A protein has these predicted regions:
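Formylglycine-dependent sulfatase
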Residues: 1-429, 437-470
Length: 470
């Protein structure tokens, strides 16, 4: 009997994409038919989250299966040397017989040079440029003409169409929908370099459309009544340095939201070419496809924007679409708590890796969820909570001392601000997500919630301890 071929893997990562910025996820006007097809023919996970909702740390968590506390990429400071030493799942896949490729944004360090674990490398320095970008192709770095999303789409499809005897693993990380920006080695960012830029053919797409705001899109004066940790940050947002950043990308406006949607049109076109390549080469049903964002984003919720770093649902929740017919029936909708830590162990598991290949990983393989669904069983044994953490950095001039550790369960969220207090009293937050899904009513001081707070603090302490060391 012929030995069954190992599955191929495609992970498509979008920069700054919110959980609701796809057609299938409820966007009121964005059309993403090719992306939506992943969830329509597979599974849509409606409770998928980022343990550290920030570009560099979360990307490192995706490829290592580890919390930022363990892998060490804790912010957007340029840790180029460290990023070469990460226990990247692609290196494990190479040992298991895979041909691997990274196409797109790396951003664990500002260098665009190839990292270990990849047979094919197409990337760019730092955030890159939307138009006529410098690309590093297998170590050859030079400027290329064109729109960056189109260029990356072409490189990804070229890799998929190559003849090979091995299974492949493609990590496809778009620059979209991040605006043009320059990030210094210390993590400070300049957003005055051109802002959001759709492809010229999509420049007027969705003109005049309106994105309805969520009930928690409140002015800062209202927010601080319930969330005192934000008092200093909101005061700093009105200074000249802060306004320069905010005004440069039209933060929180309908135009910002429209431009992001228009940028996604090129991403969706590329996904259409991916489908075509897989179908024409006969690889579609043997390929595990995952589509997600690298962190959330705020459109004015809790007075925030253009932040992504924070533990409210808009910041930590991700679209998470999976197509793999051997595991998920078309139209599956799953509400299990999954995180980006689960990607590396899932792919290594599917590739035939042993327990030793995953022993350094803190995420979980999705296999039990897939098998449980096929057998009609409940989610027994799956996680009931996860840690969310952020290490304050200096990217935005108003975000001073905003580090936190948080726990999110199926019912509650508890946020411990590690550097914030008001008159000597902690500024922590507690939300009952069942009765308050928009996190508008901080219950931390309620006498009736003392037991809940004590229990969550104990669970959080255990998660923090587990996150740090082996």
């Amino acid at each position: 009997m012929a030995r069954k071929r190992k599955p191929n893997f495609i992970v498509v990562l979008i920069d700054d994409l919110r959980f609701d910025e796809l057609g299938i996820c409820g966007h009121p006007y964005m059309k993403t038919p090719h992306i939506d097809r992943i969830g329509q023919e597979g599974a849509m996970f409606t409770a998928a989250f980022h343990p550290t909702p920030l570009c560099s740390p979360n990307r490192a968590s995706i490829i290592t299966g580890q919390y930022a506390s363990r892998h060490g990429i804790i912010d957007n400071v340029a840790r180029d040397a460290h990023s070469h030493r990460l226990p990247n799942y692609h290196a494990i896949l190479q040992r298991l017989g895979y041909e691997t490729a990274h196409v797109g944004k790396w951003h664990m360090g500002n260098s665009g040079m190839p990292r270990p674990g990849y047979d094919r490398w197409v990337s760019f320095p730092g955030h890159g440029s939307i138009v006529d970008p410098v690309l590093n192709i297998d170590g050859d770095e030079r400027q290329h003409k064109g729109y960056i999303t189109d260029l990356l789409n072409a490189h990804a499809v070229d890799f998929l169409r190559r003849e090979r005897s091995k299974p492949f693993a493609l990590f496809f990380a778009h620059k979209a929908v991040h605006p043009d920006a320059f990030q210094a080695a210390d993590g400070t960012i300049d957003l005055s370099k051109g802002g959001y830029r759709p492809a010229p053919r999509h420049a007027d797409l969705y003109k005049g459309e309106h994105f309805p705001r969520r009930p928690n899109a409140l002015p800062s004066a209202e927010v601080v009544k319930d969330k005192p940790a934000w008092k200093e940050a909101f005061q700093l947002r009105v200074n000249e340095a802060s306004r320069k950043v905010l005004d440069g990308i039209q933060a929180g406006t309908d135009e910002e939201i429209r431009l992001r949607a228009a940028m996604m049109a090129s991403v969706d076109e590329g996904m259409g070419e991916v489908w075509k390549a897989l179908e024409e080469t006969g690889q579609l049903d043997d390929t595990f496809i995952l589509f997600l964002g690298d962190n959330g984003y705020f459109f004015g919720e809790h007075g925030l924007g253009p932040e992504r770093r924070f533990a409210y649902e808009e910041g930590i929740k991700s679209p998470f679409l999976v197509r793999y017919p051997a595991w998920f029936k078309p139209g599956t909708v799953a509400d299990d708590l999954v995180t980006t830590l689960d990607i590396a162990p899932t792919l290594v598991d599917l590739a035939g890796g042993k327990a030793a290949d995953r022993e350094h990983m803190q995420g979980l393989s999705l296999r039990p969820l897939a098998q449980g669904r096929s057998k009609g069983s409940k989610r027994g044994g799956w996680r009931s909570s996860f840690l969310c953490e952020y290490f304050s950095e200096n990217a935005m001039p108003w975000l001073i001392g905003m580090s936190y550790k948080a726990i999110r369960t199926r019912r509650h969220k508890y946020i411990h601000w590690t550097q914030k207090s008001l008159d000597g009293v902690a500024c922590d937050e507690l939300y009952d997500l069942k009765s308050d899904p928009y996190e508008m009513h901080n219950l931390i001081g309620k006498r009736t919630e003392r037991g809940t707070v004590a229990r969550l603090r104990k669970q959080l302490a255990r998660l923090v301890a587990q996150s740090v060391g082996l």
